[in-house]
């Protein structure tokens, strides 16, 4: 009997030990929750990231590419206020209204509360983009926190926040910016090998939103979705319960929005891929050699992180393979297209930062030195490109804005921009119905070999174009806006027609081709002179 009792006690104690092991695992998860509240300079990491991105938004005061205005804010302004310029893409139906609709809702709210000032119309959408980027950064940190070690998560977050290209782009109203944020958020719910936070519904919904906003997001996500399909146990259910309903719903809602605003049934995503991929219309705006992304694109976008990213790739294990393959695949596919831009591969930058985090976490003796060098070498290009390079395109609109006071007068100002097409924003940064004209540059869609757009015709012989376009002084605009590189060539026209320089605004230290160092504003009539306080 005593032996039986002894055995019962031993059994009881062994059961208690099992329960203790379970409690131990709960303690580990509690530690994870504590790690998520990591503090930087005494500030919660989430709050810190938000503050960094808001500061980022304030310290980016330059222009990058025309699309950040002409394919978003300009269209939103037209949707709400009834005036704004539509480029050829909107006339051909290759742009969707889902993205501009987002800013149009903000504009409408500002209009309803009578706060639709130029400053808020420009700044509110950029704050939204900065907050979206901050949310994506926080989610990326939390993904790596549970997928890797806390050290890797911390350094991945550091790499992401100090990336000069992310700093330069994340607060801009570009479809590429939103595509990158949605791609990062989708990755946080993607079934990565060993991940604990995956949700097919969530990641596929975010991917579908990215595709609606920018159809080329499919390029980034094709290998990831294919990998998910190959590794999933129930492929039929994945197709019928995930891929099909989410894809159909997203495309259906997008088609309804686009058809409503276009006034006819239209499938924008197909038109976008047809023009940009199949017909390669983008080549009209410039072409690059096949290796450009490998030799220039990726090295510039990754920037000073490049050595650490390459080191991280060497340290990567099997579970990182799908991310590495996605970077290679995306770069290779975009390399097949003639027209190439840095922003096109922006969505793979967060993937690269994961490998950078792996590298810094592995470095022990050199970690502080590497992190310091990374911060310094990113800070310089981030501040220069954000505050100095190509700032004149925005500053000139600020200088011209006082002319809006006379927009409703019997003899309102008329402005002519003698610059490469879409060099500056338009009505979205003036917010008044002034009569504006600029040199247009739509591509030839008819296949003519001798085609020249209006901008090319003008720059081939500026004086001839001006004299034939304005044979009478009465037809001349009241103001001309041009780069200083054009000034000498049309100086005789300016003198003959009594144009006087009213403002000179710095634009860039690196003038190239038709783009000059400064932007000049000329006026014909003294009563139209711009306040001298605005002259830069």
From Swiss-Prot:
Entry GO MF terms: alpha-1,2-mannosyltransferase activity
The organism's place on the tree of life at top rank: Eukaryota
Pathway as given in its UniProt record: Glycolipid biosynthesis; glycosylphosphatidylinositol-anchor biosynthesis
Any one of the GO CC terms: endoplasmic reticulum membrane
Annotated glycan sites: 15, 176, 467
Classification via Pfam families: Glyco_transf_22
Subcellular location: Endoplasmic reticulum membrane
Enzyme Commission number(s) of this protein: 2.4.1.-
Topology of the protein relative to the lipid bilayer: Multi-pass membrane protein
UniProt KW keywords: Endoplasmic reticulum, Glycoprotein, Glycosyltransferase, GPI-anchor biosynthesis, Membrane, Transferase, Transmembrane, Transmembrane helix
Segments crossing the lipid bilayer: 40-60, 118-138, 206-226, 243-263, 297-317, 322-342, 344-364, 369-389
Function: Alpha-1,2-mannosyltransferase that catalyzes the transfer of the third mannose, via an alpha-1,2 bond, from a dolichol-phosphate-mannose (Dol-P-Man) to an alpha-D-Man-(1->6)-2-PEtn-alpha-D-Man-(1->4)-alpha-D-GlcN-(1->6)-(1-radyl,2-acyl-sn-glycero-3-phospho)-2-acyl-inositol intermediate to generate an alpha-D-Man-(1->2)-alpha-D-Man-(1->6)-2-PEtn-alpha-D-Man-(1->4)-alpha-D-GlcN-(1->6)-(1-radyl,2-acyl-sn-glycero-3-phospho)-2-acyl-inositol (also termed H6) and participates in the nineth step of the glycosylphosphatidylinositol-anchor biosynthesis.
Similarity annotation: Belongs to the glycosyltransferase 22 family. PIGB subfamily.
Name of the protein in its database record: GPI alpha-1,2-mannosyltransferase 3
Organism, scientific name: Danio rerio (Zebrafish)
Gene: pigb
């Amino acid at each position: 009997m005593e032996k039986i009792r002894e055995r019962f006690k031993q059994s009881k104690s062994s059961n208690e030990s099992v329960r203790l092991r379970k409690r131990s695992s709960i303690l580990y998860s509690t530690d994870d929750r504590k790690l998520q509240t990591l503090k930087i300079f005494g500030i919660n990491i989430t709050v810190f990231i938000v503050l960094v991105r808001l500061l980022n938004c304030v310290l980016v005061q330059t222009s990058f590419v025309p699309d950040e205005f002409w394919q978003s804010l300009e269209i939103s302004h037209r949707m709400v206020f009834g005036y704004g310029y539509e480029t050829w893409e909107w006339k051909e139906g290759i742009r969707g209204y889902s993205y501009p609709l987002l800013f149009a809702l903000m504009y409408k709210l500002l209009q309803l509360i009578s706060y639709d000032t130029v400053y808020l119309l420009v700044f509110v959408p950029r704050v939204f983009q900065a907050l979206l980027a901050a949310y994506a950064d926080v989610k990326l940190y939390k993904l790596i926190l549970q997928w890797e070690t806390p050290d890797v998560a911390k350094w991945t977050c550091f790499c992401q926040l100090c990336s000069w290209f992310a700093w330069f782009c994340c607060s801009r109203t570009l479809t590429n910016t939103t595509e990158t944020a949605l791609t990062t958020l989708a990755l946080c719910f993607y079934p990565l090998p060993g991940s604990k936070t995956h949700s097919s519904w969530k990641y596929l919904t975010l991917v579908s939103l990215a595709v609606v906003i920018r159809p080329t997001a499919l390029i980034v996500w094709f290998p990831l979705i294919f990998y998910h399909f190959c590794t999933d146990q129930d492929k039929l259910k994945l197709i019928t319960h995930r891929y099909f309903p989410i894809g159909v719903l997203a495309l259906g809602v997008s088609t309804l929005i686009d058809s409503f605003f276009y006034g006819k049934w239209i499938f924008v995503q197909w038109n976008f891929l047809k023009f940009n991929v199949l017909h390669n219309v983008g080549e009209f705006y410039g072409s690059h050699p096949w290796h450009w992304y490998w030799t220039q694109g990726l090295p510039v976008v990754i920037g000073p992180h490049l050595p650490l990213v390459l080191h991280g790739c060497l340290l990567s294990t099997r579970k990182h393979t799908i991310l590495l393959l996605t970077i290679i695949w995306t770069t290779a596919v975009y390399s097949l297209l003639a027209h190439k831009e840095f922003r096109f591969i922006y969505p793979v930058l967060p993937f690269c930062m994961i490998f950078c985090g792996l590298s810094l976490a592995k470095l022990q003796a050199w970690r502080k030195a590497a992190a310091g060098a990374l911060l310094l070498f990113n800070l310089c290009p981030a501040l220069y490109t954000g505050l100095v390079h190509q700032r004149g395109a925005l500053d000139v609109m600020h200088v011209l804005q006082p002319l809006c006071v006379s927009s409703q007068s019997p003899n309102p100002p008329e402005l002519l921009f003698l610059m490469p097409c879409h060099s500056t924003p338009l009505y979205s940064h003036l917010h008044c119905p002034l009569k504006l004209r600029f040199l247009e540059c739509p591509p030839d869609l008819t296949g003519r070999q001798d085609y020249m757009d209006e901008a090319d015709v003008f720059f081939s012989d500026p004086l001839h174009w001006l004299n034939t376009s304005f044979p009478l002084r009465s037809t001349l605009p009241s103001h001309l806006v041009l780069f200083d590189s054009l000034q000498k060539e049309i100086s005789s026209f300016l003198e003959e027609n009594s144009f006087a320089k009213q403002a000179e605004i710095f634009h860039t230290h690196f003038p190239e081709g038709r783009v000059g160092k400064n932007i000049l504003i000329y006026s014909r009539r003294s009563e139209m002179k711009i306040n001298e306080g605005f002259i830069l």
